[in-house]
Amino acid sequence: MSDLRETRLEKVSALRDQGREPYALTFDPSDRMARLQSDHADLPKGEERDCAVAVAGRVMTRRVMGKLAFFTLADETGTIQLFLEKAALGEAFAQITSLVDAGDLIGVRGTLRRTDRGELSVKVAEWTMLTKSLQPLPDKWHGLADVEKRYRQRYLDLIVTPQSRETFRRRALTVSAIRRWLDEREFLEIETPVLQSEAGGADARPFITHHNTLDLPLYLRIATELHLKRLVVGGFERVYELGRIFRNEGVSTRHNPEFTSVEVYQAYADYLGMIELTESMIASVCEQVCGGTRLTYQGTEIDLTPPWRRATMHELVEEATGLDFTAFADRAAAAEAMTAKGLPVPDKADSVGRLLNEAFEHAVEANLIQPTFVLDYPEEISPLARKHRSKPGLVERFELFIVGRETANAFSELIDPVDQRGRLEAQQARRAAGDEEAQGVDEDFLQALEVGMPPTGGLGIGIDRLVMLLTDSPSIRDVIAFPLLRPEG
């Protein structure tokens, strides 16, 4: 590798000796590869078209055959072949064939021809070195076989793996489509603080930092919820934020400590209204990104055509295990029944509601392949959701599961400040007892609720997991350009 780099550095010097700057300032590529391919698809084999073209990109392959040479040049949209002929280029032919390597960025001007083999080509009349690469590209046939290297050196992955480029193109389309869908319905995006004096809005461990001037401990936000609700109190009736969230938790194919979510709040709505909003928005996004509402994920066809299945957590657990949690008078009875069914009974699940959630996560969650809204969660695991209008002990909350993964979470928001204080104080007691993910009491948020918050439906969608679905990606690292990785060595 060091010898190859030295050779390329020698070529940098040679280019300068010949009056060619190896690191150019600018070039005007008037044409893109994909557009050339489509606009000139009718050019017959063996014929030329006398139209001036200018393209720029990275040299992916090169073949020198005596007085002829063929390069493959790639830009963001695709590739095109360069046809180089000594008779036409003169001394420049020797320069380009001896000093340009695979990986270099060059610009060329010329005309179009289609080879006898049917390959549309730019017949090069002049060339410009734009950037001399000092490192070789990965093998073009095998790409980056080392998956971790794909994540560590994403720039190489993007150069040699078209599917990776398509994944991030679709991610960008997904984000744009979500914002457009919400904007068209008069939702207003307002940015909320990333650095917060109180980490709230979710059960998660925060990252902690310190403001030197104020001598103040601060947290990277674990959710945007509490500040967006303050905005609803302030009179913004339809508000959202799409942005980064930070949670000091484990790394897996489903979790990255830094991830993207969109949270949406609509005054005078409830969780049933959020169901309609969620399935309508996601179906629309899928149509725009994938061309329809049916797609294949890891070999399984997924149908995102609304309406989607709705079922309560109690119904799904009973369907999967035969256990009716409404019949249990206390935790001991629920634990005994779960043990008899071979379900785990962790000590931290200290109530019937928490055991119901454990049974759901163990026996149901992974089997929810087609989009399913799971409704009506236990109150003790949902401290920010409104009590159910007709089911004691439950709240008006749903989670959306697709391919066995939670993709969205929504509530009829809790707007009673007294009830909210009691729930947050219970959370704070759990934190004091050692639960690092329990929330604390945010006094300013409670004061905002006391000013008065209208009935509100709230929704959060994990953008990364949604993009995994829309790009058929098995790992969250595949859809985050630069995922967090353990340092090498």
Curated annotation (Swiss-Prot):
- Alphabetized HAMAP family for the sequence: Lys_tRNA_synth_class2
Q: NCBIfam families from the xrefs?
A: lysS_bact, PRK00484.1
Catalytic reactions on record: tRNA(Lys) + L-lysine + ATP = L-lysyl-tRNA(Lys) + AMP + diphosphate
Can you say where in the cell this protein is located? Answer: Cytoplasm
Q: Which SUPFAM superfamilies match?
A: Class II aaRS and biotin synthetases (SSF55681), Nucleic acid-binding proteins (SSF50249)
Q: What is this protein called?
A: Lysine--tRNA ligase
According to its UniProt entry, this protein's organism is Synechococcus sp. (strain WH7803)
GO CC, one annotated term: cytosol
Q: How is the cofactor bound?
A: Binds 3 Mg(2+) ions per subunit.
